[in-house]
Structure formats: C-alpha cells, structure tokens
C-alpha cells in the first residue's frame, strides 16, 4: 500500500492535474465550468494557493507547464463569445495571468505541449457551454470539434484538423503522444444513440 504524502482540499470538483518540470508543484484545475485552479506542493511543505479565472472566463479542466517551468498554460472558455482560449500564467509572478492565445475553436478540453516545448496541441471538443446554464450543452446540432496546433511562443496557428462531416458530434476530449510524437485522441459521442458511429 502507498503512503499518503499530502491532502489538498478543493473548493469544488477538480478534473486534471499537471506538474511543474522544475519544482514539482502541481496545479489541479476545476472541472468546467469551474473558476478555480489550486497550486500545491505534493510534499505538503507549502500551503496551497487558489487561483481564480479572469472575468469572462472559466477553466476547462486542463493545463500544462512550459518545459522551463516559467509559464503555465490553461484551457479556458471565453463564454460570452463561445470560443476557446489558452490562458497564460507567469509562475514566478505568483501565477499571474499575463495573456491568452486564441485556440481557434469552441469547448477546448485537454491541451498538451510537445516534448520540445514548441507547440501546444489543443482538443477543441466543439461544444458550446455558458456558466449561466451550468453544464448544459448548447449547440449539439452544430458542433465543430477540431484539433489545433499553436506556436507556444506566439500563439500563432500552425495547423487545424477536423473530423469528417459525418462525425461532427464526436467531441474531441483527451489526448496522448506516442513514442514517435504522434497525437492520439479520444472522443465522446454527443448525438442520438441510434446515430452513434
């Protein structure tokens, strides 16, 4: 059996955790449409710090550190404009939000950083949500999931891949890199059961 190293209380349900490659601190992100992220020390040597999303945004449950540990990237919802953004946080500045990149889609979920730190890969699930409606999915008839590749330094769009038109209700959610650096992704079907691919 394992030994409990530390325990971190969260304001509400969390979704995913990412760890700094330099100092080992973790950040757990709220499940969407949550507005918190909690920075914690897995060894329990420092008190947790709660971050609150900026006005007009909420977290989508995922994030990643830059390889040098200086930046934290987080998937966020610009909910009044139904668009995904990547929030950028300055770690040394107390995780102060210093900007955002357009993620070129709706309903971002997981985001990964390539091993060399040059590219952000974003799974835009294609589902519009708004905190005024809880977790209600507002556009199932017009979903547009896509996979986006962004320059991690500038936010510039490197590429965007879409599923074939008949698969528009497959919401791209989670991803992984294989040993060759290829991206594999999993989807959730959000259509009627009788039309499931």
Indicate where each model-derived feature is located.
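Short, conserved, GDST-rich strand-edge loop motifs in beta-rich repeat architectures
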Residues: 75-79, 122-143, 185-196
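Residue-level detector of Asp-centered blade-edge/turn motifs that repeat once per structural unit
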Residues: 21-23, 66-68, 115-116, 178-180
């Amino acid at each position: 059996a394992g030994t409990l190293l530390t325990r971190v209380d969260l304001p509400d349900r969390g979704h995913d955790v990412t760890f700094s490659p330099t100092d080992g601190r973790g950040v757990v992100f709220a499940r969407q449409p949550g507005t918190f992220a909690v920075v914690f020390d897995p060894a329990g040597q420092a008190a947790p710090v709660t971050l609150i999303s900026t006005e007009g945004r909420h977290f989508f449950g995922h994030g990643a550190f830059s390889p040098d540990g200086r930046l934290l990237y987080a998937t966020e919802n610009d909910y009044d404009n139904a668009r995904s953004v990547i929030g950028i946080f300055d770690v040394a500045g107390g995780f102060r939000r210093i900007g955002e990149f357009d993620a070129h889609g709706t309903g971002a979920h997981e985001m990964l950083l390539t091993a060399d730190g040059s590219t952000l890969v974003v799974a835009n699930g294609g589902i519009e949500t708004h905190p005024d409606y809880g977790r209600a999915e507002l556009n199932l008839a017009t979903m547009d999931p896509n996979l986006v590749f962004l320059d991690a330094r500038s936010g510039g769009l490197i590429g965007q891949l879409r599923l074939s038109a008949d698969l528009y209700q497959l919401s791209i959610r989670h991803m992984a890199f294989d040993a060759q650096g290829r991206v594999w992704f999993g989807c959730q079907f959000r259509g009627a059961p009788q039309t499931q691919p």
